[in-house]
């Protein structure tokens, strides 16, 4: 389009799904493909040049399409909470973001405990989780109080208070999902007496997406595509997705 460097024509690119809003001076303002502007579930999409990142790899288009939301969300969470070589818990670990977080946290040298259903435990260990915890188990009983350095949460829900109980003093908690429920109970004493830090994570700096592309090009992560559908079967694809029978 007009204003785009002609040298970029023919590039293979990935487009950030969540983008900084050019209509706002607020650096935290964002817009999402398929929400604030058209392009989700579409054959073609108009994208800004500065939100289109070149990628050089032998992955298929379908494999690359699995990356922008799940892996950038996961990498953004890990960057926000500064995950390092430490013991962490990932909730909702068998979902798209959770399984991406396992691979990305492994690159950082973290020891990973993945919370999931029993039938998905072995697959998550193959991705890099050292241990798995049944999502229905009591985390305090299984892991113990003050047992992990950080929690990467995609679930929320009624068991949320246990996530702060298992954090060590000075621990960090980062969240970017609430599939089990967005309303939780917080005992402020756990927060201030243990000197915990809580992070929300949605808007990412461009370097987060650049990190993900570098991991792809260096062969450090692998795509997880369980099934693909033609665009006209999008309703069927969504129904299969909601069955949650795959990683």
Enumerate the language-model features and the residues they cover.
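Glycine-rich beta-strand-centered segment in the early N-terminal region that forms part
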Residues: 1-22, 58-59
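Short glycine-centered segments of the SAM/dcSAM-binding site in methyltransferase folds
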Residues: 12, 87, 111, 171-172, ...
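N-terminal Rossmann-like NAD(P) cofactor-binding module of classical short-chain dehydrogenase/reductase
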Residues: 14, 149-152, 174
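Glycine-rich phosphate-binding loop and adjacent beta-alpha segment
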Residues: 29-30, 158-224
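A glycine-rich, Thr/Ser-enriched phosphate-binding loop motif common to dinucleotide/cofactor-binding enzymes
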Residues: 36-41, 57-80, 94, 100, ...
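C-terminal hydrophobic helical "lid"/dimerization subdomain
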Residues: 76, 206-247
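Conserved N-terminal Rossmann-fold NAD(P)-binding element of oxidoreductases
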Residues: 88-92, 176
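Adenosine-nucleotide cofactor-binding segment
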Residues: 90-91, 106-161
């Amino acid at each position: 389009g007009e204003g785009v460097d002609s040298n970029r024509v023919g590039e293979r690119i990935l487009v950030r799904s969540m983008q900084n809003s050019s209509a706002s001076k607020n650096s935290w303002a964002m817009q999402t493909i398929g929400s604030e502007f058209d392009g989700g579930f579409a054959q073609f999409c108009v994208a800004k040049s500065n939100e289109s990142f070149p990628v050089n790899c032998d992955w298929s288009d379908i494999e690359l399409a699995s990356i922008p939301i799940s892996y950038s969300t996961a990498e953004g969470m890990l960057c926000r909470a500064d995950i390092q070589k430490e013991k962490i818990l990932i909730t909702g670990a068998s979902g798209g973001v959770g399984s991406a977080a396992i691979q990305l946290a492994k690159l950082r040298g973290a020891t990973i405990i993945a919370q999931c259903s029993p039938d998905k435990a072995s697959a998550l260990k193959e991705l890099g989780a050292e241990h798995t915890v049944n999502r229905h188990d009591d985390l305090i009983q299984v892991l113990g109080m003050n047992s992990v350095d950080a929690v990467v949460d995609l679930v929320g829900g009624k068991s949320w208070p246990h996530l702060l109980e298992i954090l060590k003093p000075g621990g960090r908690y980062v969240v970017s999902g609430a599939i089990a429920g967005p309303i939780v109970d917080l005992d402020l004493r756990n927060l201030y007496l243990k000197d915990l830090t809580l992070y929300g994570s949605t808007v990412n700096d461009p370097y987060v997406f650049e990190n993900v592309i570098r991991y792809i090009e260096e062969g450090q992560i692998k795509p997880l595509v369980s099934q693909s559908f033609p665009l006209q079967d999008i309703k069927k694809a969504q129904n299969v997705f909601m069955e949650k029978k795959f990683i």
